[in-house]
Amino acid sequence: MIQPQTYLNVADNSGARKLMCIRIVGASNRRYAHIGDVIVAVIKEAVPNMPLERSEVIRAVIVRTCKELNRGNGMIIRYDDNAAVVIDQEGNPKGTRVFGAIARELRQLNFTKIVSLAPEVL
């Protein structure tokens, strides 16, 4: 469960390292965002000499959360960290690599480019 002011790791090589959520896209008064939701975030930590810089406002899709994800078949998935992938306005990832495992639910939400870049899909 991601809410405003939550810090997230970045799971791609776009140049950002840490994000802070400031808004959940598509929700006027939703409190929490889950896996597959798009958020507006500010970059809190970045790699030097990369296109993305600190204090830049970007969009990102959540790919991992510490809160459990319950599937219809009874499977429960929990990750060790909260992580997101930086995307552009069309929903394509800004980075060329994705690190770590991501959930299968992203494929159903039309983030197929992110799923194809991921090394492991759970």
From Swiss-Prot:
Compartments reported by the entry: Plastid, Chloroplast
Residues forming coiled coils: none
Keywords of the record: Chloroplast, Plastid, Ribonucleoprotein, Ribosomal protein, RNA-binding, rRNA-binding
Any GO MF annotation of the entry: large ribosomal subunit rRNA binding
InterPro entries per the UniProt record, alphabetical: Ribosomal_uL14, Ribosomal_uL14_bac-type, Ribosomal_uL14_CS, Ribosomal_uL14_sf
Xref: Gene3D superfamilies: Ribosomal protein L14
GO terms classed as biological process: translation
Predominant place of localization: plastid
GO CC annotation, single: chloroplast
Matching SUPFAM superfamilies: Ribosomal protein L14 (SSF50193)
PANTHER family from the UniProt entry: 50S/60S RIBOSOMAL PROTEIN L14/L23, LARGE RIBOSOMAL SUBUNIT PROTEIN UL14M
Family: Belongs to the universal ribosomal protein uL14 family.
Subunit relationships: Part of the 50S ribosomal subunit.
Function noted in UniProt: Binds to 23S rRNA.
NCBIfam families in the cross-refs: rplN_bact (TIGR01067)
Name used for this protein in its record: Large ribosomal subunit protein uL14c
Organism of derivation: Buxus microphylla
Classification lineage: Eukaryota, Viridiplantae, Streptophyta, Embryophyta, Tracheophyta
Name of the encoding gene: rpl14
